[in-house]
Amino acid sequence: MNGAKKNNSQRLQILTQEEIAELYGAPQFNLMERSHYFLLPEKVLHSLKIMKTNGRNTSARLWFILQYGYFKAKHQFFNISYGDAKEDVTFIMAHYLPNDPLPNQLPSRRIQGKLKSQILQWMEYSDDMSRADQLVAEKVRHFASITHGLTEIFSEVINYLESKKIVLPGYARLQDVIG
């Protein structure tokens, strides 16, 4: 991580573009990682009620498994199309939905919201951003008395949020709270 500096929008630039992409970008799994991250616990698999063919529910089930695996890996949700995650989608379809055609579109935003809530429950995480802001502000005050290194503070904040099982806030939000 580099030293912090102000960019044109007056936000502190704490991370490089590469570091931001690594932290906030969707995972890029190899085959072994797919086998691990898309492996669903029996209780989660049972709750999905996957049938021999799933009709209109195929997209919701596919999206759930995709986001479940990504969340398991990075504790965040991703706005990603099936085309952008082609290898992961192919893997999921082959392992969980082999008799269904690939859906043409993602589930509706309303259904995505419900599925995100289910994933958060299964993983015992919270996406309460006002609580995250409060915790981050407390941690920043604490670490600012120990160090002036913004990248070190940023790393500690991320570790702290993960230990509290809170979804990682967006980079701009963390920049604003840390800055």
List where the protein language model places each region:
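Long amphipathic alpha-helical coiled-coil/heptad-repeat bundle
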Residues: 2-179
